[in-house]
């Protein structure tokens, strides 16, 4: 396969525009300028690398929700100045109500894929895993950060409430998944205004999500894991035939 063929296999069309960057006291690199700016804002205010990283993550949940979310999962490998290494496991897990027979493999799927009948493991409430990101981020901040949860969520809340410019990348991801996204009325209202994918350069305001972030900032991760947000999430899953319950 030609080396340059990676462009044809990318999730969105784009042109690389890279410029050298140097720093003497710190650097923040993410997939979106606003997320990088959020991290840099923490450093400029006297925060450390963990404060910057968590602020960047929360901001990415606003500006690149297709890639990062508080209901997603991930891991952190943190090396401290003393040379010690710490791993925080925030990976998503299968809901307790699922098992080996929950999904039926598609006999016509390509070899090596995990396609199932009806795409039930890929689309809709039945495809959702128990979230780990929020707890993982808050644990990293508690153990190794210096700022409060309210501090590191402030940039994300600002962009969600005031709005931000939609990137070509977000537009193309919405375009690619428009048929699936249209199945959810609230998602369609935000990302498919008038039935069409939200356009690059347009302003997207996610005020309800800003309120969710404010609640998280006030009450911490327990508001999701067993608290009010968790109950709301579990109720939505129950009404939508999903598998996640409050026990997850």
Describe every region a protein language model picked out.
Residues 1-37, 41, 49-248:
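Noncatalytic scaffold domains of N-terminal-nucleophile
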């Amino acid at each position: 396969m030609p080396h340059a063929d990676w462009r044809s296999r990318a999730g969105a069309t784009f042109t690389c525009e890279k410029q050298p960057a140097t720093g003497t006291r710190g650097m923040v690199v993410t997939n979106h300028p606003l997320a990088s700016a959020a991290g840099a804002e923490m450093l400029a205010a006297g925060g450390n690398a963990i404060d910057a990283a968590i602020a960047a993550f929360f901001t990415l949940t606003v500006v690149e929700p297709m890639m990062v979310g508080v209901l997603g999962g991930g891991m952190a490998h943190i090396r401290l100045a003393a040379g010690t290494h710490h791993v925080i496991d925030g990976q998503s897990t299968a809901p307790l109500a699922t098992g080996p027979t929950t999904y039926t493999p598609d006999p016509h799927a390509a070899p090596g894929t995990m396609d199932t009948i009806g795409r039930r493991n890929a689309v809709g409430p039945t495809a959702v895993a128990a979230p780990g990101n929020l707890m993982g981020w808050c644990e990293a901040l508690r153990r190794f950060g210096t700022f409060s949860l309210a501090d590191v969520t402030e940039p994300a809340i600002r962009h969600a409430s005031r709005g931000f410019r939609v990137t070509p990348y977000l537009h193309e991801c919405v375009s690619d998944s428009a048929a699936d996204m249209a199945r959810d009325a609230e998602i369609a209202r935000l990302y498919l205004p008038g039935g069409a994918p939200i356009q690059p350069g347009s302003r997207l305001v996610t005020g309800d999500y800003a309120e969710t972030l404010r609640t998280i900032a006030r009450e911490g991760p327990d508001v999701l894991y067993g608290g009010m947000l968790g109950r709301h999430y579990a109720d939505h899953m129950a009404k939508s035939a999903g598998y996640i319950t409050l026990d997850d």
